[in-house]
Structure formats: C-alpha cells, structure tokens
Amino acid sequence: MAQSEDMTRCISLCMSCYQTCLGTAMNHCLETGGKHVEPKHFRLMMACAEMCRTAAHFMLINTPHHRHTCGECAEICTECAADCERVGGMDECVSACRSCAQSCGAMAA
C-alpha cells in the first residue's frame, strides 16, 4: 500500500525534527551549558528526538499503530517547542517541533 502525500510529508517532518533536536542538543546545548543542559530540558529534547524517529519508523513500516506514536509525538513536540522557546536561542528547534507536532497531530486523528 502506497503512502499518502500527508504521510510522506509527516515522515519528512519527523526526520527533520529528529535531526534538529538531536543535533541542537549535542552541538548547541552541551556547548552552551547553563539552562540548556538542565536535566528536565535535556531529557525532553532527547525524548522528542527519539519519539520523532519512532513515529517516522512506524509510518515507514505502514502499521496502523502509527496513529498512537504520532499522537505521542505531537504531544512531546509541543512540549519541547515550548521549553526550547523558554530556554531561548533555539528558534530552529522550536520551528521544527511545531511543524512536526501539527503534522503528527493530523496523522493521529
């Protein structure tokens, strides 16, 4: 069964968010320190990255369970976007998380 355009776009947004969150955490937050490495914030970024990767994986294998992973991904991405905005200096992460959350929310519906 072929993927819909919406699913293909969602997979792309999930992978982009995965790359952005993980890359920002490892190359920006760890180097910047301070509130960027607060355990709650850093764990949230790691959870967000991994959930995005997992949601993309579930869509790629075309399991109907992707609705569950996409729902959780939307929730975590929304929380991560808000926390990255709170910490500051992470506009790329905020944008990637919001785009992914919106797309995953639609896939979960």
Where are the predicted features?
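Amphipathic alpha-helical hairpins
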Residues: 1-109
